[in-house]
Amino acid sequence: MNYQTFQPHPNLAALISCYWTLEVPASDHPDRQRIIPDGKIEMAFILGDNIKRYTSGQQFILQPRAFVLGQTLEPFYVEPTGSVNSFSVSFYPYGFANFADVPLKTLANKETPISDLFGEETARKLEQHIIEASNTQERITIVEKFLLNRLNQTTTVDTIVKSTIATLVATNGNTSISNILKKEPSKRRQLERKFAEKIGISPKQLGKVIRLQSALKILLNQEGENLTHIAYESNYYDQAHFIKDFKEFTGINPKDFLGHKNMELSSAFYK
């Protein structure tokens, strides 16, 4: 597996976490990989063979060749049909709203073809240019030109949304929304509405995902730590609360997470 990340143009750095590429040789017996929520939105281009996305049991669909994956609140499985070669743009929680004309709640928990978001002709040209590019740097240049042009035509995300996310990130999801709005409690409904439109999930849900991400980093980078310590470091009420949230978003308990064959891909994103 070859996973690499690349930094965005300074004018996009506040909206894009990174670009990343993934290359995996074809296998006669590929393992399904469990993808877990991370609070970000992805715009991905499949350059290699098709990838299955399991919907239930043995039922699957093929992921679109170019799509946006909205916010997710539960794990799902993917499986390559051959060799993997992907290029992706990873947006911060509020980042993609600056380029979209639809409420982001309509993108949650699914892959949406970019043609549905940018129009058939625009999407076709973008996808063709990405595929025909000879290397990753060329792809970054192409997608950045597209995004910078589109950014100029789109309104920005509200300050209340940005400040709420900044607080959640700064505290690893350990601040209640009531505490964030303690000086303006009447804005709770407004915030919920704006989150649905610009993020795709509620502020409380995003906070839970961010806190889980903090716990995952500790779990993966400090192997050997007991679960009580990880729960304490991540500010969960207790170990039971930590395990409950962990299973909700990953579908597996923390002890089984490390080294699990279905977690190889998700684990790579934390190294």
Each language-model region and where it sits:
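Catalytic-pocket segment enriched in acidic/His residues
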Residues: 189, 193, 201, 205-221, ...
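Residue-level "edge-of-site" marker
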Residues: 209, 244, 260
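Alpha-helical bundle regulatory/interaction domains
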Residues: 1-172, 176-178, 183-188, 202, ...
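A secondary-structure capping/hinge motif
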Residues: 197-201, 245-257
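Extended amphipathic alpha-helical scaffolding segments in membrane-proximal extra-membrane regions
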Residues: 176-177, 194-198
